[in-house]
Amino acid sequence: MLYIIGGRNNTPAGNIDTASVDRYDPLRDEWKPMALLSVPRNRLGVAVVDDCIYAIGGGNGNTCHTSVEKYDVKQDEWTTVMSLNFPRIGRFWARL
């Protein structure tokens, strides 16, 4: 499965940061909307640990987030799990 999480929709009317999450199933060639993030996030970091996806920081307009959300792929549910010491935007994360 491939997940697209948050981001920015650029339109002639303006830029809108989004809380949307979509999942692509390559076997079915099908996109499906999933549970929304708790807040819109653009330029967020994403990491995968076990069966969970973490959305880390990012921004919404002029606001930079400190929150970290965990997505349970089996339950299709986001939970806020912690706060960063300071806001992070445009970062990349890796699990070793």
Residue ranges and their predicted role:
Residues M1-L96:
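Kelch-like beta-propeller repeat domains
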